[in-house]
Amino acid sequence: MFKVRVIPCLDVKDGRVVKGVNFVDLRDAGDPVEAAIAYDAAGADELCFLDITATHENRGIMLDVVRRTAEACFMPVTVGGGVRTVDDIKTLLRSGADKVSINSAAVARREFVKEAAEKFGDQCIVVAIDAKRVPGRDRWEIFTHGGRKGTGIDAIEFAQEVVSLGAGEILLTSMDRDGTRSGFDIPLTRAIADSVQVPVIASGGVGDLDHLVDGIREGHATAVLAASIFHFGEYTIREAKDHMVRAGLPMRLDP
């Protein structure tokens, strides 16, 4: 049986870890490399770096942060933000990233996903989907550019399409729940997870440890991502994993 993964997410803006509510109102949470080293020591299964300004403000990729993290950490690292070309992916992988997350560029040009998967293998290509519920309907729309730009694209159909093109994993964030601490958008998570044959990482809204369990058990995700509950010391990675084990979920526990 697969082991459920617990993945801290480090949103990085101007070289600092930040955490906000609904993609805005950002507050500082520390140095990204120091945070990565701490999470590695704490037993995180993976780490996700997202440069949340890279696409919006056309910034380059934070290669120095990636390089220093890869040198210091054993856990797999996924990096996203400002990834627009095959060369961007190559540079990140050479800098030490294990997987690369594509967001706005995949929406703008679906074939980019296919090109990336064919060149580097689907195991290292993650498509990040930021979705918001369409009012009054069981439908979710994709937003890009750090959640600033609506697309009119249906999230479920898009997920199925990018998986058919070679995406090896979906990183799914509910913009309605992001930073609210009210739990994952379970209907959205389940709808995406049940519609594709690749791992789905649930993201957006974790406020307590039960929410992590719900993402797997009710949302059918294969991994859960959280930020603020870990960044500000409310819970440790070990506490999260122990709680999930008590709930009957298969976890990797370090000695």
UniProtKB/Swiss-Prot annotation:
The reaction(s) annotated as catalysed by this protein in its Swiss-Prot or TrEMBL entry are:
5-[(5-phospho-1-deoxy-D-ribulos-1-ylimino)methylamino]-1-(5-phospho-beta-D-ribosyl)imidazole-4-carboxamide + L-glutamine = D-erythro-1-(imidazol-4-yl)glycerol 3-phosphate + 5-amino-1-(5-phospho-beta-D-ribosyl)imidazole-4-carboxamide + L-glutamate + H(+)
Record pathway: Amino-acid biosynthesis; L-histidine biosynthesis; L-histidine from 5-phospho-alpha-D-ribose 1-diphosphate: step 5/9
Q: Where in the cell is it found?
A: Cytoplasm
A GO cellular component annotation here is: cytoplasm
Coiled-coil region(s) at which residues?
none
Q: What class of enzyme is it?
A: lyase
Annotated InterPro entries: Aldolase_TIM, His_biosynth, HisF, IGPS_HisA/HisF, RibuloseP-bd_barrel
Gene3D superfamilies, per database record = Aldolase class I (3.20.20.70)
Q: Give me the disulphide-bonded residues.
A: none
| Signal sequence bounds | none
Chief subcellular location equals: cytoplasm
Keyword entries, A-Z: Amino-acid biosynthesis, Cytoplasm, Histidine biosynthesis, Lyase
Q: Where is the active site?
A: D11, D130
Q: What is its EC number?
A: 4.3.2.10
According to the record's subunit comment, the protein's assembly and interactions are: Heterodimer of HisH and HisF.
What does it do? IGPS catalyzes the conversion of PRFAR and glutamine to IGP, AICAR and glutamate. The HisF subunit catalyzes the cyclization activity that produces IGP and AICAR from PRFAR using the ammonia provided by the HisH subunit.
Q: Which NCBIfam families match?
A: hisF
User: Which family is annotated?
Assistant: Belongs to the HisA/HisF family.
- Protein name (record): Imidazole glycerol phosphate synthase subunit HisF
What species does this protein belong to?
Answer: Rhodopseudomonas palustris (strain BisB5)
